[in-house]
């Protein structure tokens, strides 16, 4: 199965300026991400940058990159432009690997691409893993997803979901008392067909998307389906803040450790 990985890379992060270029063990973070993607089954890996500095940094390390406009409202909009610049056919499966995930598991990238290829009724594929602590379940920065019997997303929310009414009524808040099956944490990895990526920016934003600040809710709002791969493993940490960056640097440089990988 052939697919393309696109990595959106925007320099204007408010919490961590020039984030794609942050040094981790001697390499820009976006290069770490690209190398993980290149270890997957992707036929093509391209960084979609908004600044020539990112394009040049990628070129120095043998990573393909292209320059996109700076005024895109979302990463999906940036990838839609990249699909046009690369002249990808509408049927091409495109996996959106976030540029701040230097520990992304290549096998998880493959799993998302394969899932979408096997689910023609879905316009997107994504991933999740089981939540095993109440603190994570109640954390609004942890996005939860609920799926139907066919493994398709019913909804995403920052709120605890599904709400375990009887357990909470009984005061069962310890980690071992979470519902069975356990709630799922959404992993921000997406697979699309290029044709849908081109159509996505034309879909009107939804009220619930704005309330939750979750872009994927627009897809469900407009009646489309998202397939969800449930990974047995928790993904490695992403990088949003200076503290996150220090944590990943320690994993990759100081200790040489990495999170375990999903079996292919």
Curated annotation (Swiss-Prot):
Pathway: Nucleotide-sugar biosynthesis; CMP-3-deoxy-D-manno-octulosonate biosynthesis; CMP-3-deoxy-D-manno-octulosonate from 3-deoxy-D-manno-octulosonate and CTP: step 1/1; Bacterial outer membrane biogenesis; lipopolysaccharide biosynthesis. It comes from Methylibium petroleiphilum (strain ATCC BAA-1232 / LMG 22953 / PM1). Coiled coil: none annotated. It is an enzyme of class 2 (transferase). PANTHER family: 3-DEOXY-MANNO-OCTULOSONATE CYTIDYLYLTRANSFERASE (PTHR42866), 3-DEOXY-MANNO-OCTULOSONATE CYTIDYLYLTRANSFERASE, MITOCHONDRIAL (PTHR42866:SF2). It comes from the Bacteria. Keywords: Cytoplasm, Lipopolysaccharide biosynthesis, Nucleotidyltransferase, Transferase. One of its GO terms (cellular component) is cytosol. InterPro entries: Cytidylyl_trans, KdsB, Nucleotide-diphossugar_trans. GO terms for molecular function: 3-deoxy-manno-octulosonate cytidylyltransferase activity. It catalyses: 3-deoxy-alpha-D-manno-oct-2-ulosonate + CTP = CMP-3-deoxy-beta-D-manno-octulosonate + diphosphate. This is 3-deoxy-manno-octulosonate cytidylyltransferase. It is found in: Cytoplasm. Activates KDO (a required 8-carbon sugar) for incorporation into bacterial lipopolysaccharide in Gram-negative bacteria. Gene3D superfamilies: Spore Coat Polysaccharide Biosynthesis Protein SpsA, Chain A. One of its GO terms (biological process) is CMP-keto-3-deoxy-D-manno-octulosonic acid biosynthetic process. Signal peptide: none annotated.
